[in-house]
Amino acid sequence: MPKLKTKSGTKKRFKLTASGKVKRGQTGKRHGMIKRTNKQIRNKRGTTIMADADAARVIKNFMPYA
């Protein structure tokens, strides 16, 4: 059986932490920012840790050797 490939979009969007959690960028910053408050925009900076159920799905389906 051939080796499974990691999805290239997944390896660009997600990183695994040392403890095995999945880190991702914040969502909701592509357009429509004019109607957001400055606090909302500021809080969307940086990265966040995914929920365990979502992270498990990402790892199982898209990053087979992670």
Swiss-Prot record:
One of its GO terms (cellular component) is cytosolic large ribosomal subunit. GO terms for biological process: translation. Pfam families: Ribosomal_L35p. Belongs to the bacterial ribosomal protein bL35 family. It comes from the Bacteria. SUPFAM superfamilies: L35p-like. GO terms for molecular function: structural constituent of ribosome. Keywords: Ribonucleoprotein, Ribosomal protein. This is Large ribosomal subunit protein bL35.
